[in-house]
């Protein structure tokens, strides 16, 4: 079991201000408790939300900030009351590391909707210390917010499933959209969208990818297995596809009109918003009234759903398409992600990186 150190110094890569530039940062992990798991970080995926947070797009960033919420690591120590995990287990940590455990969402095991949830970074833990994420060598996490990575799933492949994977799986399950034969749309083909295509296809759905241009058509259909591809600026094609979809999973993280996509939905169709957008979205009410259509949202998934989607991907043979990078490349990776220059998810090889040495190399390369 090992004796848990009350405090320990670690090095992560942190943003110091709204430029979002990351550099090495030494800090002390929070005190460990009886139900805590100490995780040596192996890999951490890069999510578009990491950009929003590092650059203070949402207006609530606190610095220094170590991002990263798609964390896969190895358990190196456990508290005396930890029963679910042992040293050597490969585990995952996602967006949430704390909740009140008393509210209705917590009692319903959908703790991601708890109003007192604690984010894995850019938040304050119950002891008053800031939480820091997975772009670091080590994390301390309550066992409730840790999931086992099942056998048959490579750790680097598992990382994006802890956010992108469960983010598309959860609404499909919750809204009863898992039956084979449904016709679904995936709006946006980034890290979340590409997993949306894969998960929906594995459920037996007819999947249409909707994008602003035709440049991803071959990838969507030939590589990811989509059944159809719609260019949203092609008025004739959009009109021909009206009233054809049971649901649309909207993964676009920037402001965009909703009405063109509402027109694609059948009677009782659902438009599920997943992208984090800081500006109001608008539509005219008849677009939903005349087809009894619903605009709704979903936020990541519960710990139980995270475990489910990991096993679902193992059972269905699904993997995320990733580009593995070292920590010294993380700033370039964030810049490339911001301009959509990745297919489809960056994953940082944290354990294989020397954060201090790679920082010096990155600084030398920029001079």
Swiss-Prot record:
Residues that bind Zn(2+) 2: 100, 103, 106, 114
Binding locations of Zn(2+) 1: 47, 69-70, 163
CDD domains recorded: CAD1
A Pfam family hit: ADH_zinc_N
Free-text function comment from the UniProt entry: Involved in lignin biosynthesis. May catalyze the final step specific for the production of lignin monomers, like coniferyl alcohol, sinapyl alcohol and 4-coumaryl alcohol.
Gene3D superfamilies given in the database record: Medium-chain alcohol dehydrogenases, catalytic domain, NAD(P)-binding Rossmann-like Domain
Cofactor: Zn(2+)
Organism domain of life: Eukaryota
InterPro entries: ADH-like_C (IPR013149), ADH-like_N (IPR013154), ADH_Zn_CS (IPR002328), CAD-like (IPR047109), GroES-like_sf (IPR011032), NAD(P)-bd_dom_sf (IPR036291), PKS_ER (IPR020843)
Principal EC category: oxidoreductase
Family: Belongs to the zinc-containing alcohol dehydrogenase family.
Protein's name in the database: Probable cinnamyl alcohol dehydrogenase
Organism: Zea mays
SS bonds (residue pairs): none
SUPFAM superfamilies attached to this UniProt entry: GroES-like, NAD(P)-binding Rossmann-fold domains
GO MF, one annotated term: coniferyl-alcohol dehydrogenase activity
Residues given in the record as NADP(+) binding sites: 49, 167, 188-193, 211-216, 251, 275, 298-300
Subunit structure: Homodimer.
A Gene Ontology BP annotation from the UniProt entry: lignin biosynthetic process
């Amino acid at each position: 079991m090992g004796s848990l150190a009350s405090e320990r110094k670690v090095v992560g890569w942190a943003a110091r201000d709204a430029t979002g530039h990351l550099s090495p940062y030494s800090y002390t992990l929070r005190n460990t408790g009886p139900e805590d798991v100490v995780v040596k970080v192996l890999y951490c995926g890069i999510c578009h939300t990491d950009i929003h947070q590092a650059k203070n797009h949402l207006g609530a960033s606190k610095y220094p900030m170590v991002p990263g919420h798609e964390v896969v690591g190895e358990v190196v120590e456990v508290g005396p009351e930890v029963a679910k995990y042992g040293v050597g287990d490969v585990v995952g940590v996602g967006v949430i590391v704390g909740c009140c455990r008393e509210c209705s969402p917590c009692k319903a095991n959908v703790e991601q909707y708890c109003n007192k949830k604690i984010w894995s970074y850019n938040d304050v833990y119950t002891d008053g210390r800031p939480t820091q994420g997975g772009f670091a060598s080590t994390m301390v996490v309550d066992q409730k917010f840790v999931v086992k990575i099942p056998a048959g799933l490579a750790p680097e492949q598992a990382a994006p499933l802890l956010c992108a994977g469960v983010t598309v799986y959860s609404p499909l399950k919750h809204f009863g959209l898992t039956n084979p034969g449904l016709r679904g749309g995936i709006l946006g083909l980034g890290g979340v969208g590409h997993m949306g295509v894969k998960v929906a296809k594995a459920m037996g759905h007819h999947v249409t990818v909707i994008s602003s241009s035709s440049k991803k058509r071959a990838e969507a259909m030939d590589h990811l297995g989509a059944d159809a591809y719609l260019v949203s600026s092609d008025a004739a094609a959009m009109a021909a596809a009206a009233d054809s979809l049971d649901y649309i999973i909207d993964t676009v993280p920037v402001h965009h009109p909703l009405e063109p996509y509402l027109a694609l939905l059948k009677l009782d169709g659902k438009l599920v918003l997943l992208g984090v957008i800081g500006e109001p979205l608008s539509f005219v009410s008849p677009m939903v009234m005349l087809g009894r259509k619903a605009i709704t949202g979903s936020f990541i998934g519960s710990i139980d759903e995270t475990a489910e989607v990991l096993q679902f991907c193992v059972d269905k043979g699904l993997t995320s398409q990733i580009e593995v990078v070292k920590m010294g490349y993380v700033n370039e990776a964030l810049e490339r992600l911001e301009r959509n220059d990745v297919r489809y998810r960056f994953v940082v090889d944290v354990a294989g990186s020397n954060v201090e040495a790679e920082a010096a190399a990155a600084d030398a390369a920029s001079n």
